[in-house]
């Protein structure tokens, strides 16, 4: 029985990956890899930046904040530009801009220069985020395939490769700019080779929206935005506080302190690669609600105490959050009466907002009430997200989506 289950899981896993052997689909996934690969490599040089600029960690935090503000700012115009030029061209050029500009971060000699460069880089990163998710949703719709979650899995994979391989390369390449420049050249060449005709991809026609209305006035999109906000706050909370929780509450040995985050990241990547076939089989509603339940089970294990129990809990949390955001990206581009680019931009914007306010809220909770209360608060977030999902996936919404897509599996 166990052997059959393992073989079944392996078949599902390979089904989610095999599509990317085709140039067209790998070209769609490549911007996700480039985005995280360049980001994780740049993050390796934050100690170098601190020493070079003679700034404190809090000052570096301002620089990171400027990057986030740049990303959020870009969301205000991304949708309009995508409608004009198309998802393909927008993704193509925003990726080139991102690759080029992030190199400049290691060349900064003053804090204000770093903040300006990261603000502009963040704007391109935000543009890239909306573009590549919109493009993936468009190709999914045109080709009647599911691979959005796997694209986000490639983002996780790119982050892992950048951090691990980048750490090794730092021993052989002593100049940060040379390292970043070589990586940028490789990324740019791959992008030019594999993106190809995807530059021409564009939604067939814009959806007419009454003037004076805002995307969030659509209750379905608002529901997805709330889910995205809360889930991305959850992701950020684990990434920010997992290591400290392992150290201060679990009292893990130094060797094991980082393994909570490692297990969370690993199972998030694995989950994203396997989630598309599961979504295709059971539907988005089941996947999202089941994933939220898995997150809660993971939190319960994390709070139970004990090193191995906590590691298993973080693994479940990573697997649980893996497919939720990709699913709402996909669904937000298919809402009747909402332009696909508006839907994706709205979900991306609320997600970035979660990353902005999440650390502030969690920092206050940790300082005032202790680290365990962070995870108790996450349970509240997940519960609200679950209720939002219940109301969002109502019969009226499902019928609209089915009539639009002619495919009941999408719900």
Where are these regions (language model features)?
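Helix-breaking motifs and short loop linkers at transmembrane-helix boundaries and internal kinks
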Residues: 54, 86, 107-112, 251, ...
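Conserved MFS/SLC helix-loop-helix module at the cytosolic interface between two early adjacent transmembrane helices
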Residues: 73-109
């Amino acid at each position: 029985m166990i052997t059959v289950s393992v073989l079944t899981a392996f078949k599902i896993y390979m089904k989610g990956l095999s599509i990317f052997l085709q140039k067209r689909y790998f070209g769609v996934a490549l911007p996700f890899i480039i985005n995280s690969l360049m980001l994780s490599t740049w993050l390796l040089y934050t100690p170098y930046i601190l020493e070079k600029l003679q700034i404190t960690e809090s000052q570096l935090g301002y620089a990171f904040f400027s990057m986030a503000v740049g990303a959020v700012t870009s969301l205000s115009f991304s949708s309009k530009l995508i409608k004009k030029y198309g998802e393909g061209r927008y993704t193509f050029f925003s990726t080139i801009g991102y690759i080029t500009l992030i190199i400049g971060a290691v060349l900064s000699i003053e804090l204000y220069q770093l903040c300006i460069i990261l603000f502009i880089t963040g704007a391109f990163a935000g543009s890239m985020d909306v573009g590549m998710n919109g493009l993936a949703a468009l190709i999914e719709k045109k080709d009647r395939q599911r691979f959005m979650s796997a694209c986000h899995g490639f983002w996780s994979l790119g982050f892992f490769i950048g951090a691990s391989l980048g750490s090794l390369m730092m021993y052989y390449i002593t100049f940060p700019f040379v390292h970043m420049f070589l990586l940028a050249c490789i990324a740019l060449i791959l992008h030019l080779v594999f993106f190809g005709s995807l530059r021409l991809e564009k939604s067939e026609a814009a959806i007419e929206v009454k003037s004076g209305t805002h995307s969030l006035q659509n209750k379905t999109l608002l529901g997805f935005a709330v889910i995205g906000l809360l889930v991305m706050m959850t992701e950020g909370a684990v990434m920010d506080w997992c290591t400290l929780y392992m150290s201060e509450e679990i009292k893990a040995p130094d060797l094991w302190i980082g393994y909570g985050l490692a297990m969370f990241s690993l199972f998030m990547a694995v989950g994203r690669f396997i989630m598309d076939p599961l979504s295709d089989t059971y539907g988005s509603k089941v996947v999202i609600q089941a994933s939220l339940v898995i997150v809660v089970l993971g939190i319960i294990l994390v709070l139970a105490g004990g090193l191995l129990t906590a590691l298993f809990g973080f693994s479940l949390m990573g697997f649980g959050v893996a497919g939720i955001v990709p699913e709402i990206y996909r669904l937000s581009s298919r809402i009747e009466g909402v332009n696909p680019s508006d839907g994706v931009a709205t979900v991306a914007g609320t997600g970035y907002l979660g990353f902005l306010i999440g650390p502030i809220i969690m920092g206050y909770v940790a300082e005032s009430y202790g680290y365990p209360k962070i995870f108790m608060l996450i349970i509240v977030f997940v519960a609200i997200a679950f209720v939002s999902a219940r109301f969002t996936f109502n019969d009226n919404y499902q019928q609209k989506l089915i009539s639009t897509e002619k495919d009941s599996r999408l719900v």
